[in-house]
């Protein structure tokens, strides 16, 4: 965001919400911009997923550790005290680039990048994903890359549903028998299926993370202004997590063979709170610094600490899948619409 963009949005906020609320929102947005500059050009941190041990890595997009912990009573493989991993990114594009490419590293650390250290692991990795930023990955560096969003996108849900991602992951596991399998679901990331009517996801194709033009932008601005509560948005966020566990994770665990399956995320989600927030159970205290959603390169702990829950999986053979993915070509305009619908534009 440029200074002019910030000034324009500030005027809109003050006009819509008044000097006090609008001014506070603009100050928070300015701080987020400062944190972005720090994360891009100075202080940042995290650990590559290829540094950790796993056979199947399940990526639940935007899933916080405390959100996953709320599922502990419903699924026996999810503990009350969720272990964590420090992600390389605070948004998907940063996570994809830093884990799978050399593109996002400055020259002083280029000798530590993924293609230097993890080329062998990547060559034995199948990546089945519904995240559009997989386009930044060199397909030849992987054993197999399946961009499910290209043919599995659902216009009614404004996202790629979890069941088709599971079907494609099971097909990849059975066909290629990869040493490593990454399965990247878009849920619990917005659009939140329980809030589509309220914010008009069914009427407007685009949404975003900051501002007030598209449905999710409207949601975050209303949260910033106190029109909608954190509890309401959190409830919708939790409902999306239940959706991906029921339709995605559960059938996956019953239809692949893996000694170590890890449930994790690319980054977290923040709701603009300033005080110290305690995760469920024995998790650490952390701040959100007045930041909303998941802007890239913002090195705050609440965005960078993600779940790292280990379990196992056994292929029952119950799920019947097609080996070859459907053929589909996505135009640039369709791709832009989908990026907007997921809050990236």
Question: What residues fall within each predicted segment?
Answer:
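Catalytic domains that recognize anionic headgroups
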Residues: 1-345
